[in-house]
Structures are given as structure tokens and as C-alpha cells.
């Protein structure tokens, strides 16, 4: 089956990196290409390096309707059997373009959905109504966690149209040699003995990285223990504010910007911290566990769905500076260690998740018809 994945952007966010990982592990019977509406970033480069075709559509803002005929032509010309969309804007334009091009095997993955939020933005009645209208153009909507599935149903998506398929992780990809850890730390300017607290994600308020700056400032005021560093992997609009906060607090913070070598950057850390309260899956937490790190986390539906023994190296905390300060203080005086990947990592093995997605494609089946009239799409 020939499948086009339509995604809003390809900066190095969790949904974008998950798409890349899925495509690398899908069975060969499915040939996949990618269309990106805007902002092709490091993930687009990585996809091309792996041999995947990436079609850039140069969308200029949320209401650039000119992208719709361009995407429709692409789908019709390259004769895809199925169209699979990722993220809100791609879901709106991608589903409609697929139907206009005569493709009926249309599905979407919902990566970031909360009761009143979608992808970190408020989802009022108008947004929800538009979402539901677009959702009707597809065959099914994939939820990456039970929390997302519940929200879809609460929004009005029928139960039979929701398919739960969690994110996956490639544990083998996080086994980084000790020598490489030393080299990466040197590249980042991290002193050999510095206790390095790391975090991965877009630099936006919802990730609550300011909590970590406060915690490290409080940690520095306590006697004993090694010097500390904060390593923030990601890019976003909060970068300047976080840098200013760190400077005022006397916290040495290293900002890597957008990177696609996350396993090596995790290897440079001594602990991964994830104080976000708004996660729909918690992929970064699983990545930290796969890398053998002790993990301090707040929201992680992926772990909450499993038993208490699924991730003994992860500790759940309130998203407060006080809680993270106490937990980090206990870790910084303990000997550095690498833990074996826990059962949770193996539960979300990417090979199994990709195989389930391939089976879903097979069940939906390639179906093409003549392009319907636009008015009929919304009936």
C-alpha cells in the first residue's frame, strides 16, 4: 500500500520524531512518503537521509487555503492508496484534500489532546466543531493514549471510530557507549564532575521547565554535593525567558536548540526531569528510561497505564520546585549509575507498534473513488 503521511511541521518535536521512528519500522509492504505543510526542520532532513520522500507544501499561516489544491494535486498525481495525518492543522487540510483526490482510506493520529486543549492551545467550541467536521472525513482516528481516546469520545467522536495505538520506542537506539557520553559532555561544555539535570521538549510554558530552574537554584544554595548544570534539549518561544530566569537565579543552563540526536544528549545527562502536567503520552520519560537514566516526572499517561513495577527507575512528583529540589538533592549525592531498560520500555517496543499500524492499514484497505463534490463532504 502506498501511504502519504501529512504532518503540520517537521521540527524536532515528540510527534514528529515519533512519525520518523514509525516509518523506519513499518513493514516493507507499505511504501510511505511525507507531506509537510510548513516548517520542515531537522526531522525532514533525517527522513530524507533515510530515503523517504518529503514533499514541502510551503503553507504560509493557518488560513493559507492555497495549500489545499497543492496537497490535493500531490495526492491525486502520486496515486496514494491511503492518507494518514498528524497534528491538528494537517488533520483539517489533509483529510479534506484526500477526499477531494478520491482517497477514502483516510486516518489521523491524535498526538496531543486534552479536554480543553489541543497541542497546547485552548480548544473552544468553534475549534471542537471544526475538528469534528474534519474527523468525519476520515475512517478512523488513532489515539496515542487512553487519555487521548477518552477526550476524543468526550468531544463527540463515536467509540467505533477511535483506535488506541500508543507511541513506540526503539530501546536499542539509546544504548550509547560511555566514551560517547564523555565526548558529548565535552562538546556541550559540561564539566566532567558536574551533576547534569536534563529535560527534553519544546520550550513552551506547558512543559514547566521554569520549575527546574527554580529547583536547581535551590539546590545550589544547599551545602555539599557537586556543581550542577541544567541541560535543555529543544527550541521554542520560552527560550529567552528561561535563559533570563537562569541568569537571575545563578543557574548554569545549556540550551542545545533543536536537535535530532536525542539519545546522545540523554547520555550526557545524570537524570531526566519532566515536570509537565499536560502530557498525553510521555514519550520523553520513556526515552530517559531507555537511556538508563533515573527519571523524575509528573505527568506520564504511558506509565500510569501500567503497573507500579513497570518503571522502577521513574519517580512521580508534584510539579513544584520544592518536590524536584528534594528529589534531585537525593540523586546528586548518589553515585552516577545507568539502569537497565525497564519493562515499560519493552511494552512500548516500536516494532510491535509499527506492526499494529501496518495491520490497521491492511484492515482499512486501499480504496479509491472519483473525487466527490466538496459540498457532499460535510453532509
Question: What positions do the PLM features span?
Answer:
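Aromatic "clamp/platform" in nucleotide-sugar-dependent glycosyltransferases that forms part
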Residues: 258, 277
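Nucleotide-sugar donor phosphate/pyrophosphate-binding loop at the beta->alpha transition
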Residues: 65-69, 104-107, 114-137, 150
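A short helix/loop element that forms part of the nucleotide-sugar donor recognition site in Leloir-type
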Residues: 175-190, 336-342, 374
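Nucleotide-activated donor-binding/catalytic signature segment of Leloir-type glycosyltransferases, i.e.
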Residues: 243-257
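Short hydrophobic beta-strand element within catalytic cores of glycosyltransferases
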Residues: 36, 294-298, 304
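Conserved acidic donor-binding segment of nucleotide-sugar-dependent glycosyltransferases
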Residues: 309-322, 330-335
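A conserved mid-protein helix/loop that constitutes part of the nucleotide-sugar donor-binding site
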Residues: 13-21, 195, 199-220, 237-243
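Carbohydrate-associated surface elements
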Residues: 147, 168
